[in-house]
Regions:
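PLP-dependent enzyme catalytic core of the Aspartate aminotransferase-like
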Residues: 169-216
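Short amphipathic alpha-helices in soluble, non-transmembrane regions
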Residues: 128-135, 139-152, 192-200
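A generic structural motif
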Residues: 13, 72-75, 121, 183-188
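Conserved small-domain helix->loop->beta segment predominantly found in fold-type I
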Residues: 51-59, 66-73, 77-84, 93-142, ...
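Structural alpha-beta junctions
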Residues: 98, 150-159, 204-210
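Active-site C-terminal subdomain of aminotransferase-like
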Residues: 1-100, 106
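Short conserved micro-motifs at the rims of enzyme active sites and ligand-binding pockets
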Residues: 18-20, 35-37, 77-79, 124-127, ...
Length: 216
């Protein structure tokens, strides 16, 4: 990070404030001029108004939430929250790794990881398959991932999002995965176990996709 000229931060993520609060820190304070703007009726060139150094004009005062959080939660509080989120992500990744019904796609560096439901027979088929056959299997898995994610959301017990990412071991093929960010301090190990159990049950409810996968 010390090699960067600037660092941008989305405070609504691990600083636990509402969306809309972002900030940028410059190594060289003079670089703030690169985002300076002026208007004839306000923020005239040469004025000392800090509002000229922003990508926005009128603002809602979200900076106050960042300021307040830095003082109320403080450094020890953020350290506790972030360490807990990292621990939970590692725990969840280990749960996935040790369950032969799932494939851990990206291991967490901090608190974000991706995975998907892949029955053990399908995992073995993917290992043996040539690229063209892998593509066929992955497209069916994409359908199954979408089915599970939508049904889980509709059930209302738990929720994970989904996204597409390139996976190196599948020759850069883009596959649909579950995307999890473990930032909620109220999330427990039991909740994480329940999420996987529910996803396994939902997969069995697929009357067309799962049978096709298991037949390959």
């Amino acid at each position: 990070i010390e090699r960067a000229d600037s660092v941008t931060i989305d405070a609504h993520k691990q600083m636990y404030v509402p969306m809309g609060a972002g900030l940028v820190v410059f190594k060289n304070p003079a670089l703030v001029a690169s985002i300076e703007h002026h208007a004839e009726y306000i923020l005239r060139k040469g004025s000392k108004d800090l509002g000229s150094h922003t990508l926005e004009g009128s603002r809602s005062g979200m900076a106050m939430l960042v300021y307040s959080s830095l003082h109320i939660i403080s450094r020890p509080g953020y350290e506790l929250l972030i360490n807990q989120s990292i621990e939970k992500a590692k725990y969840f990744a280990d749960l996935i790794d040790n369950d032969d019904s799932f494939e851990l796609v990206t291991r967490p560096e901090l608190c974000l990881l991706t995975y998907r439901y892949v029955p053990q027979l399908t995992q073995q088929a993917l290992i043996k398959a040539l690229p063209l056959s892998q593509n066929t299997i992955n497209r069916l898995l994409d359908e199954l991932t979408k089915f599970i994610q939508k049904r889980q959301r509709e059930n209302g017990q738990s929720f994970v999002s989904r996204t597409k990412i390139e996976v190196a071991k599948y020759q850069g093929d883009k596959v649909l995965v579950f995307r999890v960010v473990l930032a909620n301090p109220l999330t427990t190990h039991e909740i994480l176990k329940d999420i996987l159990e529910e996803q396994k049950m939902i997969a069995q409810e697929s009357q067309t996709i799962l049978p096709k996968l298991l037949a390959l």
